[in-house]
């Protein structure tokens, strides 16, 4: 029995037409009233052929009015589909109204933001508590599934095109998790493929119970077909490219084996434009105008492999006109220092031997420290990435990837936060918004926020961020705004209309700006909202508890037990923190309690944004999709966003930030398993949306399989224009790091770094190399094999052993059973995590056609949908963040971030370089990759430097000292790491050397017996070479002289304040075992829009912290040095003026060095004065008077030798 299809008014009807002649030679046209009528066409080149429509045939289910695709006389034939718009007629009016309503419902279903079961459930678990999921009640966010909405509206018909049969439910739900309604017959045809709704494979449990739906044999066939589909052979694409009929093997369709026609590869390789076609998927579009005549003399055969040989990156050395003089000056200054120190040792000062000895010891150490700092700077390089080649190689249609899906590997972004009070949630929200809007394939990006404090404020701020991201991310993609951090974008002082051509940009920018302002208000009001909500719920709980206790007391009194009744009146004093759905927050409470304290709470995982689909989801007009802006033609998908708070319990060491990072590594491996990891601090946002692509260029280029991480320079905002405390640190990031890039690679500095996941797992590089000979230039290739352990090894031996990647399949076809068996012992007991390791290694490989790559992956292997995220996966992730998971494993010792130091970043990078890995320094040319905030207050800056220096002292006294590095580390790379661990000890000699001028002025002695011409000549040569080296460094690094001088000043400030304290703390930890604890550096908030990121306020408000004086014990040594030198200059000047035999040379020598010390400490003194104009003038007057009094008293106490008798006889009198 036939049925009339319900088509909407004016709906297009697709008709397949092919030119076929009748047997009699006349053209006969036949029409069919169906949706599709595919008819074979034998030639597209025939212009005389007439059009014929085949008779309509029904399929087996009598649902489609048209021929089956597999039917027909010739299977190799292809079809042309024409779209015909049928106008509405009176007999179709009723169906049109119904179908229009159905179409509107479908459109609303597409554009409505949905929350899956995973994104609407918070998972908790940990020690002595079961893993459970708590479904959150989101009333206003569209939490109902598509199936429930369809059931509520009564729309239970099949959604397949041309079918209106009733849909079937498997266990009360559709066969696919996306909620796409499909009937039984359509499902039987699609069961072996993908769901027509979400374009992903059907769930494993979606098969029906009927025996005629999908049998076991069909399952085996489905598995084999999916494997064949993953391989994507060229023959399967025969129908999807514009290849003419002559390219098919004749008679292949009638061979009776049911297989499609084979593709003639030999003929295809030598086809011309005339027979193959011009402008198709494989032919370059930049050819000549001879599109129909084949190759001519002027045309060259296209080189289809040219793009594979184009490099993704370029490395250029510094110009020899700059580098050669730079190296020569280093050699000249080294020789001059050697002769100078030899002369100083041979010419002591007999009048002040102790002064001479101290000065010589300091000068020898300074020369040694300068040599360690200069040697790694001999080979600076510059690198550049080509994003066009990256897009062409990994995102263009190919035979294995006809749809042009992205073949780029996945990236998991880690954002760490520990205390929302010192790290404002709005700062973290801006960082996450910039990550979600990054220019990278949405389905390949995942963002994880680690809240090490387990605060509800961070959780709800992240939920607000996910809600605002649905407006902000499409706005960024539509208009291509930069930067994609809303606070920085709306706060920048420039013309935001530059290069904008869309007429709706101004209107939509105004809407988004207002929405962002409301978003900031909501985030800023969260602490008060949480407090009021918790107080209300706690008050209700207390009332219910009191009522229940009064009832029990009354019952006890009636029973005659008065004491029990009086005791029952006491109410519970526990003050819980409540979530918005009326349940207890499983993390840290505002009033700490058992299992809810900062160091004692369960593990929490919540997917705020579920993983996106593999196919783009285009938006629509604001009125249709319910959004704020028009997103027509804009992909509105969002990357996966996950909240993670690891479990903490008393008695288990949580290892600070390194432990949190390792917990994120394990969680992400189970939930998304991106082969690359980007680490960002909560105050470092993505300033260049293409930064991730630039990092991938270095990872995926030739030799990229040996790159463990790509480090980006740190750039800062909110720093005062004069950069008083050298917060930009450009000498380190633009000079030292560029120079190390020419060796084995830069250090890891804690943020803005893209890691290779397998390198973090402690595996060795694919091709290890030992460096020997002069400067480590002679290389020896190693063939690494697994060494069997005999007996007990020390921890150091275990760290130095090789750990090669367990291959998915060896060349001989067998797996490395021994290596696979060792993985659970190294990585823990999670089988899911262990199984993800070889998958991540395979996805991080280079392409097979990359030059020099022997074990690459085929192109298009990653252009497949991601596996859906289910509750079992999240429950497994809860297990790997438990407090006891790392026990008896190698986490923190060899795997992941290394424990035992407050500078875990430097140690982690050192371990990778020590195994033979390389790193790359990526400086983006046009825009900074990432930007963050820096502490502009003097006290905060000194405490930051103290933490870094203390970590260096710990490294120096540990087995991570570069003196014990393996032969796989280059010699100059060892020198750089050794200098990183030794530089705090220079502060001991710097303190003494800064006091030597004052001691010399007070005592009237000098470090040399007399200022000879030889001594002055040595000083002149050493000073001139230092200045010339600085100028050349400025030339090849691009920094300014002002920035170089600020760095020199703060080197003295830090060396006389924070570094000595770091040496003392490090010695106490090594000798006495005193543990070192640090507090977080407070991040400036940006909630008001005046300070912080991109603030628009005036200088006084933006840099208020710069002028705030907070006293610290670290300020005592620099203040003492300044006062002593100032008083010494005054005393020496007064003594020389009143002396009968003045020694001006000693005064000038001592005063010159004291002035040198005071010039370097000038920013420190300026910071102590606070805001300009706030210090009263009387302070300067009294300071001058006190200095004069001290000077005169010193002259009276210790007068010159010629004036003692006169002063003693006549008393003290002014001249």
Curated annotation (Swiss-Prot):
Q: Recorded E.C. number(s)?
A: 2.4.1.-
- InterPro entries attached here? Cellulose_synth, Nucleotide-diphossugar_trans
Keywords attached to this entry: Cell wall biogenesis/degradation, Glycosyltransferase, Golgi apparatus, Membrane, Transferase, Transmembrane, Transmembrane helix
Regions of biased composition (Acidic residues) lie at 207-222
* UniProt topology in membrane: Multi-pass membrane protein
* Coiled coil, from the record: none
Q: Which domain of life is it from?
A: Eukaryota
What name does the UniProt record give this protein?
A: Cellulose synthase-like protein D4
Gene (name only): CSLD4
């Amino acid at each position: 029995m036939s049925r009339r299809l319900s088509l909407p008014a004016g709906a297009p009807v697709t008709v397949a037409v092919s030119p076929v002649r009748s047997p009699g030679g006349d053209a006969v046209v036949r029409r069919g009233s169906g949706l599709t009528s595919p008819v074979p066409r034998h030639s597209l080149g025939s212009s005389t052929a007439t059009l014929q429509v085949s008779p309509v045939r029904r399929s087996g289910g009598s649902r489609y009015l048209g021929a089956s695709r597999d039917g027909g006389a010739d299977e190799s034939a292809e079809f042309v589909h024409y779209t015909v718009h049928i106008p509405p007629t009176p007999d179709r009016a009723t169906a049109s109204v119904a179908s229009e309503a159905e179409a509107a419902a479908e459109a609303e279903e597409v554009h409505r933001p949905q929350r899956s079961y995973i994104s609407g459930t918070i998972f908790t678990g940990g020690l002595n508590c079961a893993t459970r999921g708590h479904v959150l009640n989101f009333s206003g966010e569209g939490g109902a599934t598509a199936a429930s909405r369809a059931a509520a509206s009564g729309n239970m018909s099949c959604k397949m095109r041309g079918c209106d049969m009733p849909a079937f439910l498997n266990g009360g739900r559709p066969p696919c998790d996306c909620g796409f309604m499909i009937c039984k017959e359509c499902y039987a045809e699609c069961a072996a493929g993908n769901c027509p709704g979400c374009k992903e494979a059907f769930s494993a449990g979606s098969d029906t119970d009927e025996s005629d739906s999908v049998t076991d044999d069909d399952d085996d066939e489905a598995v084999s077909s999916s494997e064949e589909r993953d391989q994507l052979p060229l023959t399967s694409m025969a129908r999807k490219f514009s290849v003419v009929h002559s390219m098919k093997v004749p008679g292949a369709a009638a061979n009776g084996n049911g297989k499609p026609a084979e593709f003639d590869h030999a003929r295809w390789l030598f086809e011309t434009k005339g027979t193959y076609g011009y402008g198709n998927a494989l032919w370059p579009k930049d050819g000549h105008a001879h599109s129909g005549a084949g190759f001519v003399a002027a045309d060259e055969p296209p080189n289809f492999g040219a793009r594979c040989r184009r490099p993704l990156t370029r490395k250029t050395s510094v110009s020899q006109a700059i580098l050669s003089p730079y190296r020569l000056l280093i050699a000249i200054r080294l020789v001059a220092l050697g002769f100078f120190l030899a002369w100083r040792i041979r010419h002591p000062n007999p009048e002040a031997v102790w002064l001479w000895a101290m000065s010589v010891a300091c000068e020898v150490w300074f020369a040694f420290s300068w040599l360690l700092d200069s040697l790694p700077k001999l080979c600076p390089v510059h690198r550049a990435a080509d994003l066009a080649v990256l897009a062409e190689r990994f995102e263009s249609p190919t035979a294995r990837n006809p749809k042009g899906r992205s073949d780029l590997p996945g990236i998991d972004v880690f954002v760490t936060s520990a205390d929302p009070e010192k790290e404002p949630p709005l700062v973290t929200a801006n960082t996450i918004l910039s990550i979600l809007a990054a220019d990278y394939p949405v389905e390949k990006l995942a963002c994880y926020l680690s809240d090490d404090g387990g605060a509800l404020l961070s959780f709800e701020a992240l939920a607000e961020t996910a809600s605002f991201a649905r407006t902000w991310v499409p706005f960024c993609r539509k208009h291509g705004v930069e930067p994609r951090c809303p606070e920085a974008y709306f706060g920048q002082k420039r013309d935001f209309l530059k290069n904008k051509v869309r007429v709706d940009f101004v209107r939509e920018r105004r809407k988004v700006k207002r929405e962002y302002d409301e978003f900031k208000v909501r985030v800023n009001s969260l602490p008060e909202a949480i407090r009021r909500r918790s107080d209300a719920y706690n008050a209700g709980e207390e009332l219910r508890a009191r009522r229940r206790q009064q009832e029990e007391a009354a019952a006890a009194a009636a029973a005659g037990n008065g004491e029990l009744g009086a005791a029952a009146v006491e109410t519970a004093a526990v003050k819980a923190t409540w979530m918005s759905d009326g349940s207890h927050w499983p993390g840290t409470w505002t009033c700490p309690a058992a299992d809810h304290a900062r160091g004692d709470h369960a593990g929490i995982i919540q997917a705020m944004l579920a993983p996106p689909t593999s196919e783009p989801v285009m938006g629509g007009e604001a009125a249709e999709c319910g959004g704020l802006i028009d997103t027509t033609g804009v992909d509105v998908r969002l990357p996966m966003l996950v909240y993670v708070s690891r479990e903490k319990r008393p008695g288990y060491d949580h290892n600070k930030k390194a432990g949190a990072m390792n917990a994120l590594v394990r969680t992400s491996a189970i939930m998304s398993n991106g082969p690359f990891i980007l680490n960002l601090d909560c105050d470092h946002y993505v300033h260049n949306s293409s930064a991730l692509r630039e990092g991938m260029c270095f990872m995926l280029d030739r030799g990229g399989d040996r790159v463990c991480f790509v480090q980006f320079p740190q750039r800062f905002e909110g720093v005062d224009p004069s950069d008083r405390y050298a917060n930009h640190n450009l000498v380190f990031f633009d000079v030292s790091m560029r120079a190390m890039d020419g060796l084995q690679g830069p250090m890891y500095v804690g943020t803005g770094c893209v890691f290779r996941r397998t390198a973090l797992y402690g595996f060795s590089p694919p091709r290890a190399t030992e460096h020997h000979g002069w400067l480590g230039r002679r290389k020896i290739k190693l063939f690494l094999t697994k060494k069997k352990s005999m007996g007990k090894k020390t921890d150091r031996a275990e760290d130095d052993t090789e750990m090669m990647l367990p291959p998915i399949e060896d060349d001989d076809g067998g797996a490395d059973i021994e290596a696979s068996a060792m993985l659970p012992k190294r990585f823990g007991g999670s089988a899911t995590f262990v199984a993800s390791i070889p998958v991540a290694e395979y996805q991080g490989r280079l392409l097979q056609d990359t030059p020099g790559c022997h074990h690459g992956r085929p192109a298009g292997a990653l252009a497949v949908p991601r596996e859906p995220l289910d509750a079992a996966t999240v429950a497994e992730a809860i297990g790997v963040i438990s407090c006891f998971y790392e026990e008896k494993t190698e986490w923190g010792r060899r795997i992941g971030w290394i424990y035992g130091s407050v500078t875990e970043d430097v140690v982690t990078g050192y371990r990778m370089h020590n195994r033979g890995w390389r790193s790359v320094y990526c400086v983006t040319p046009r825009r900074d990759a990432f930007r963050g905030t820096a502490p502009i207050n003097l006290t905060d800056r000194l405490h930051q430097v103290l933490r870094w220096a203390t970590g260096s002292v710990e490294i120096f006294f540990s087995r991570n000292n570069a003196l014990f590095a393996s032969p796989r580390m280059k010699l100059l790379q060892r020198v750089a790491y050794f200098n990183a661990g030794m530089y705090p000890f220079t502060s001991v000699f710097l303190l003494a050397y800064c006091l030597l001028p004052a001691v010399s002025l007070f005592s009237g002695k000098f470090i040399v017996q007399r200022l000879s011409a030889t001594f002055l000549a040595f000083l002149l040569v050493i000073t001139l070479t230092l200045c010339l080296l600085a100028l050349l460094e400025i030339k090849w690094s691009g920094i300014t002289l002002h920035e170089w001088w600020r760095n020199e000043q703060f080197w003295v400030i830090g060396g006389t304040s924070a570094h000595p304290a770091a040496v003392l703390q490090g010695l106490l930890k090594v000798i006495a075992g005193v543990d070192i604890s640090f507090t977080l550096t407070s991040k400036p908030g940006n909630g008001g829009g005046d300070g912080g990121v991109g603030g628009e306020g005036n200088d006084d408000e933006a840099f208020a912290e710069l002028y705030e004086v907070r006293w610290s014990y670290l300020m005592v040594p620099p203040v003492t040095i300044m006062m002593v030198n100032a008083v010494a200059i005054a005393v020496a000047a007064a003594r020389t003026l009143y002396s009968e035999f003045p020694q001006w040379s000693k005064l000038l020598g001592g005063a010159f060095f004291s002035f040198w010390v005071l010039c370097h400490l000038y920013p420190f003194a300026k910071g102590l004065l606070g805001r300009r104009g706030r210090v009263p003038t009387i302070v300067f007057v009294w300071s001058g008077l006190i200095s004069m009094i001290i000077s005169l008293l010193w002259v009276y106490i210790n007068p010159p030798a010629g004036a003692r008798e006169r002063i003693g006889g006549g008393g003290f009198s002014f001249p």
